[in-house]
Amino acid sequence: MPIVDSGSVSPLSDAEKNKIRAAWDLVYKDYEKTGVDILVKFFTGTPAAQAFFPKFKGLTTADDLKQSSDVRWHAERIINAVNDAVKSMDDTEKMSMKLKELSIKHAQSFYVDRQYFKVLAGIIADTTAPGDAGFEKLMSMICILLSSAY
């Protein structure tokens, strides 16, 4: 299932949730490194996205990005937001509320182009559970909610 950022997706089954939790637990064990690796891959593959992060200006190489405390801080926030979504899979109202708040911030305060949510979600999915339809469905749910304020 390709990741989408509009419309709706079917609810996650119990089997999908269990598979997501198992895959995510493995990734989240080293969340700081994983988060930085994901964000570095995102910025090196999508350099235009870096314009939305003034603190990352001048960080032109993967090594520069990895060594930046600002990048590490933001990577941790992203990973923890996904972790919150994984923990909230059984309480979609809670997940929705948190992600809609993030959507408002990104749309109205940071002016982030919403297309980047889908790109980043793809990298997270490929890092966590490559080709897993359930994880891609969760990433779609996250993208749809993050796009809600646009």
UniProtKB/Swiss-Prot annotation:
Record flagged with keyword Transport: yes
Record domain Globin: where: 11-150
Origin superkingdom: Eukaryota
InterPro entries per the UniProt record, alphabetical: Globin (IPR000971), Globin-like_sf (IPR009050), Globin/Proto (IPR012292), Globin_lamprey/hagfish (IPR013314)
TM annotation in the entry: none
Pfam family, one: Globin
Example of a GO MF term: oxygen binding
Residues binding heme b, per UniProt: H74, H106
UniProt entry keywords in alphabetical sequence: Heme, Iron, Metal-binding, Oxygen transport, Transport
PANTHER family named among the record's database cross-references: CYTOGLOBIN, CYTOGLOBIN-1-RELATED
Assigned protein family: Belongs to the globin family.
Subunit description: Monomer.
The protein's name: Globin-1
Organism the protein comes from: Mordacia mordax
